[in-house]
Amino acid sequence: MSDTKLPSEDHESDANDEQNTDVSVPTDAPQPTETNAPKQTLSRLLRFPLKWSRSSEARAITTTMAGAAVLAAVRAFTKNRGKNRTKLDEVQEAPVPVTAPEKTAKKQKKQLSNSLADRREMLEQGGGQKRIDAQHARGKFTARERIARILDADSFEEHGPYIEHRHSAFGLDQQRHPGDGIVTGFGRIDGRRVAICSQDFTVLGGSFSEIQALKIGRLLEAATAAGLPILTLLDSVGARIQEGVWSLAGFGDLFWRNTQASGVVPQISVMLGPCAGGAVYSPGLTDFVIMARGTSYMFITGPDVIRTVTGEEVDIDTLGGAETHAARSGVAHFVAEDEDGALVLAKRLLSYLPSNNADDAPTSETDENVTSPNADALDKVIPPTTEEAYDIREAIKLIADLESFLEVHADFAPNAVVGFARIDGQVAGFIANQPAHLAGVLDIDASDKIARFIRFADAFNIPLITLVDCPGFLPGAGQEHQGIIRHGAKIVYAYSEATVPKISVVLRKAYGGAYIVMSSKMIRTDVCLAWPSAEIAVMGAKGAVSILYARQLKAAAPEEREQKRQQLEDEFQQEFNSPFVAASSGHIDDVIYPRETRARIIAALDYLKDKQPATLPKKHGNIPL
């Protein structure tokens, strides 16, 4: 037998793989006549699929039948309806073929699933494998690798991964990447919720765009509303020049949001690459800046522009490297040896900070055998002579819990020391003069360093502990001309404005204006203590005697002059510079042994923990910036 092909009718609803399907029927099948046509036609319609029943042959058969023949067929079918019903039931119970729309829906669903997987894989590729390899060759991680390294495993929830820029000038329409060069979202660090964003240098150099501003802005808004700390991992060439004013407008919006979040949630910037031009102001507005040595740079104008405009030759490291901003400009609060070190520093710093300004400073369970240092060693911190230097950090470490001190701005203005530590498990901010550098005098940079730290601690409910050993402000025309009066006033303002518990301990020198500004009783410090070695006066005994007893010393015989001077200095020291003089007038709450310092501070923090000072209503003060 030979097969005859029955062409299928062209319907749009048919699936592509069914449009050319052939159905074969035997050529020796009985041909329809007037008498057998109804039965044969009905039989064939029952035996073959609906598709064949719609074919041209079926239509030809049905349209050529006479009315009588059709009527006869109906009567015959009715007469044998039981038999025919059985045949129909058999047809209905047969497996129902999948229709074209159902197959199409399943195919589309599979395509969508594959598309999502493909898109997620594409997100991991950033600007492409070639650029990722180049990033690794520089000793740097990609944006997503950095997030994975700092957050708890599997805790990152990304927001806005598929947003793309909408610009076309200068070939941007051919350079669209999902996320537009920044990854934003939420995650956890040591179980704590945080907001995080990370610039992707593999996408257009991480250049700051309108979409980056949109994504970061949404993150800042959500984090501020939820009371979450914000970590920004920066690695960018600066503004996206091709976007023009849209990029600049994005900067402005970001700066405004940084300012609104200031004092509400902690903001930490981690510099892991370049940051140039207007982009530098965002990290400059945040609370802390961490830089990675050798790979991170910050500057408003680069070496080439400086050379063109001023003729000055300067390399990128000297201009804006980590060492420069840590030691000279004070922009960087911490410096790490590499990216991993910077991320570890950020995690450690966060452990000292509350999530927002409504939370108290963090506390942790303590074990006295582990956290308590050798308090008796404090009795040996102060050298026997007032002119001899020592490292104030040794005193801090003996007062605080073991291994808990995290110094901030360690390389900037080293004549002052600030940082966070735990004392009996509670986080506190430490401020101290450093006799090992410039005898611990206050200058412009030290004043800025101290005032800024005070204001941050006060904003986030972190108590302040001040250790005083300061002979005064640094003298000199340079300091006066650069505004030491204005800068020194910042310390007074910051301490006076602060409402957190404030405790001060005078270890040795507290002379003149430096005594007043360094958390004295007169500017409302809650607890003021002093060691027996404290010298609280307008100036030291030696200087005072030289002024007050100048005539007597001049009149003394040369061979007796030095003996007379020493006698006068000892008398002045006992009568005017002794801590008991200040204690008797109420300017010092108590004179204590050095070994008692830790216990007294812990007790003071305990009874001051619910301190609620009254403040005058005002919009804000006007700190002498």
Question: What are these model-derived regions, one by one?
Answer:
Residues 2, 13, 36, 48, ...:
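Short, low-complexity interaction segments enriched in Ser/Thr/Pro/Gly
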Residues 91, 95-625:
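Ligand-binding clefts of soluble mixed alpha/beta catalytic domains
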Residues 37, 58, 86, 556-564:
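Alpha-helix capping and helix-coil boundary motifs
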Residues 53-61, 70-86:
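Short hydrophobic alpha-helical membrane-entry/anchor segments
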